[in-house]
């Protein structure tokens, strides 16, 4: 009789992310010799309701950012929780680790430790059954490649520039395939670089690979992007749309610091706006530019404001909740009940396990909303999010610029998946967006 597959050993180690900060990597070894390895990413602009990323706090080591305690939890408590269990039962594995932690926000053992083991288990299980990860998780229906939401200009917390808006992205909706979408986007990226250089701007890149020029205003960034799309030979508002991540919670918090609670401070330019002025501002930008998606247009605590924003712009553009929902089904279901936003950004480490991530995607899609699988600003060479995007047929991925290996690794994995799927591969283009009827 064939021996049942089980988890035999779990290893943990401290490695570096793309910002030079330590993160947790886990390695799961199965009874048949199959191995899975995964690393936890890390964010710079984080939501208050995210699961806890455990850091050592020892200022004498990595300026307090070490993760040796989290690594110890991988080797001890989490290893004890999962060893001997069947790796093909992901739900049970994740539940065992969540129980071992015993807190609401994974604050005892760390979401970074739990997530690394969770993803490594899925990878080991996929290897054991000789399937690529996207197929192991998604079955034969996993064949939709995502439209990239490609970051080409960085601002906010992600860059030392004068831009308040954190990310300006392009979406190649007019392409016929993922590989063509990547080629078109990269052409726009290089065209933008030429334009910036010609006008004397520095073309150094931010955390996510986009340029970080010292522009005078956020609108200037949009002007340059529209020009780059045209100069590259494409049509703005047809071949390409623009997406923005305002990371407005940062603006809300900055206003609080100067005693203007409930308002929004564009801290790099000094402008203070009320909720209604913020909504007017976003609407004006949408009227002027081919904007299709706005992420975190208001703060994570501002549910009333979000309601107004959704009423005003929800039928026109994709309104994405990131800090608002933090990949948490409790918060997503509140958003659904209150009809707030129409899209959810999905980040594994906000919730801290694969099962909970997949549940969040399922809940979002069942509502008829869009789900965007996303990286963090602190990434590694780990490409799991590429497989998850295809496994869940999410239709959209946010994983930075076509520069920096930590970002490009995900695009390259999607190219491999597309080639492997062959004729079965689907690139949704405009169909990925509910608002583009």
Swiss-Prot record:
Binding site for Mg(2+): 245, 295, 322
Compartmental location: Cytoplasm; Secreted; Cell surface
Name of the protein in its database record: Enolase
Record pathway: Carbohydrate degradation; glycolysis; pyruvate from D-glyceraldehyde 3-phosphate: step 4/5
EC number assigned by the record: 4.2.1.11
Subcellular location, principal: cytoplasm
Species, as recorded: Lachnoclostridium phytofermentans (strain ATCC 700394 / DSM 18823 / ISDg)
InterPro entries: Enolase (IPR000941), Enolase-like_C_sf (IPR036849), Enolase-like_N (IPR029017), Enolase_C (IPR020810), Enolase_CS (IPR020809), Enolase_N (IPR020811)
Essential cofactor(s): Mg(2+)
One protein family per Pfam: Enolase_N
GO biological process: glycolytic process
Cofactor note: Binds a second Mg(2+) ion via substrate during catalysis.
EC category: lyase
Keywords per UniProt: Cytoplasm, Glycolysis, Lyase, Magnesium, Metal-binding, Secreted
Top-level taxonomy: Bacteria, Bacillati, Bacillota, Clostridia, Lachnospirales
GO cellular component: cell surface; extracellular region; phosphopyruvate hydratase complex
Catalytic activity: (2R)-2-phosphoglycerate = phosphoenolpyruvate + H2O
Stored SMART domains: Enolase_C (SM01192), Enolase_N (SM01193)
């Amino acid at each position: 009789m064939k021996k049942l597959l089980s988890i035999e050993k779990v290893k943990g180690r401290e490695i570096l992310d793309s910002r030079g900060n330590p993160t947790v990597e886990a390695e799961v070894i199965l009874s048949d010799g199959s191995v899975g390895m995964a690393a936890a990413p890390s964010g710079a602009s984080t939501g208050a309701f995210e699961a806890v990323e455990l850091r050592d706090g020892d200022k004498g080591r990595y300026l307090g950012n070490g993760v040796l305690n989290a690594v110890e939890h991988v080797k001890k408590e989490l290893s004890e929780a999962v060893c001997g269990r069947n790796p093909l039962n992901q739900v049970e594995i994740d539940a065992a680790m969540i129980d071992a932690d015993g807190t609401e926000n994974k604050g005892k053992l760390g979401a970074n430790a739990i997530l690394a083991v969770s993803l490594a288990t899925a990878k080991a299980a996929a290897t054991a059954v000789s399937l690529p990860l996207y197929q192991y998780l998604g079955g034969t229906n996993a064949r939709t490649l995502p439209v990239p939401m490609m970051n080409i200009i960085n601002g906010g917390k992600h860059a030392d520039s004068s831009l308040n808006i954190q990310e300006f992205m392009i979406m190649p909706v007019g392409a016929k395939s993922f590989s063509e979408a990547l080629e078109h986007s990269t052409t726009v990226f290089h065209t933008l670089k030429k334009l910036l250089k010609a006008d004397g701007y520095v073309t150094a890149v931010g955390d996510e690979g986009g340029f970080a020029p010292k522009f005078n205003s956020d609108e200037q960034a949009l002007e340059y992007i529209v020009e780059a799309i045209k100069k590259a030979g494409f049509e703005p508002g047809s071949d390409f749309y623009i997406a923005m991540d305002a990371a407005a919670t940062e603006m809300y918090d900055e206003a609080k610091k100067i005693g203007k609670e409930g308002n929004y401070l564009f801290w790099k330019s000094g402008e203070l706006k009320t909720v209604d002025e913020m909504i007017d501002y976003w609407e004006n930008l949408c009227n002027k530019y081919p904007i299709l998606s706005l992420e975190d247009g208001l703060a994570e605590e501002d549910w009333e404001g979000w309601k107004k924003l959704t009423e005003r712009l929800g039928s026109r553009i994709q309104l994405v909740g990131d800090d608002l929902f933090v990949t948490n089904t409790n918060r997503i279901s509140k958003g659904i009940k209150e009809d707030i936003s129409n899209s959810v950004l999905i980040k594994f480490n906000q919730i801290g396990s694969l099962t909970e991530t997949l549940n969040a995607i399922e809940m979002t899609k069942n509502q008829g909303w869009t789900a965007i699988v996303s990286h963090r600003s602190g990434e590694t060479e780990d490409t799991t999010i590429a497989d998850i995007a295809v496994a869940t047929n999410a239709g959209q991925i946010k994983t930075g610029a076509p520069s920096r290996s930590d970002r490009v690794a995900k695009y390259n994995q999607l190219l491999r998946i597309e080639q492997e799927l062959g004729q079965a591969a689907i690139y949704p283009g405009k169909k990925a967006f509910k608002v583009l009827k």
